[in-house]
Amino acid sequence: MNKQQTKFLIAFAAIAMANKEGFTVDAANLQPVTSGYAVAVADTQNSFGLEGLANVVKYVSEHPNINAFGGWYNREDNMYYFDATVIVNELEAAKELGRVNKQIAIFDLANLKEIRL
């Protein structure tokens, strides 16, 4: 992990600790994303813990088309998951990208609602 990735890892971990229920932040500036639809990337599915977080940071740094980081707490298994995330403005396009990435849901950031696929 290079110096820039390490800085993102530390910042990302702090964001996760401050937002225990979940969050989505812009990959470039780590500012909250409040509109559009968050679609997790299949390649970082089931990333949890420090190792999972490091994998997501590395993946995003190597894939410039990934424009956000996400994290969410799963009450069913009591684990905090991290995702490389694409923010899509159009609902139908987001749903299609979600299906391509084998997701069970996407997230409407403006209304803070899960959309099952």
Where in the sequence are the language-model features?
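Conserved, structured core segments of small domains
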Residues: 1-117
